[in-house]
Amino acid sequence: MITDEKKDERLSIILEPGQIEASAVTPPFLHLPAANLFELRAARLEQLAEGNALGDYLRLIARLCRIQQQLVDNPPGGMPVAEARQRLCMDHGLPPLAADSLVREGPWLVWLQALLEHLSGETRGPMGEALQVLRGSDDNQRKGWGIALLAGQYDGVPAALVPFLGAALQAAWSSWLLALPAHQLKPAGSLAQCPACGSPAMAGVVRNRGKHNGLRYLACSLCACEWHVVRVKCVYCESSKDLRYTSLEDDRHAPGKAPLRAECCPGCDSYLKQNYLENDAAAEPLADDLASLALDIRLDGEGFHRLAPNLMLAPGGG
């Protein structure tokens, strides 16, 4: 049986990737997150926690997601980027919510403080200890941790603090994204780079409804913006040669129907997880990524490298 990827692969032999992208109907470039993104994410995490070896951790992240939703619904701070600066960035094809600059400017720190206030009753156990470290830190220290986390410098951030820092950062940037005139966003310099904030993609999503049906979108690890990238192309080296698709061995679906598959590139030895909503309409990039760390372990053993961050978990911190 020919899988969806095999069909795409045969097509890519006939047409170059650029020709596929420039088809008669231009695909919608963006797919923005829902206003209740974090509520949906929490529900998915709770569903996936059942029977999962990391069930307790997934439930913790679900709890943080519900707090994230409360923060987005009642923002502790406003849009930090003036309209003139937004327009200037978008006119020049630059991300208006540039993470590398805003994380240093610090408007997200009030979001972290608000998150800590929601968790003020947590004082015991490993979680209480991690929160106490955050409560006892000043803005300069918190900012330094945030900078290190978004730069992927995990040795500069205590692993136990990552979910709380990541939750605050995600809530802030997702809220700002929803306040942007996003239709003016333009593709970034790299396929795997978010056009809204410049952060790396966390995973891919092959959508199954309406004008987005059958199209692949990459989901930002920070603001949750999704942008279109043609299928059967490595998002890191842009090669379409000899890509293979790997799923969990204990998945109950046939290989070509697995709802989560990793696109593995032998050219640069990288991989990217992808959710196929046709096979599981409830899939959610961050939740399904955390629930499938066994696939990361397997691919690491095969010599493939993960370049996509998940801000709710430090590598090796599971």
From Swiss-Prot:
It comes from the Bacteria. The keyword DNA-binding does not apply. Its main location: cytoplasm. GO terms for molecular function: ferric iron binding. GO terms for biological process: protein maturation. GO terms for cellular component: cytosol. It holds the Pfam family FdhE_N. Keywords: Cytoplasm. It is found in: Cytoplasm. The keyword 4Fe-4S does not apply. PANTHER family: PROTEIN FDHE. Belongs to the FdhE family. Necessary for formate dehydrogenase activity. This is Protein FdhE homolog.
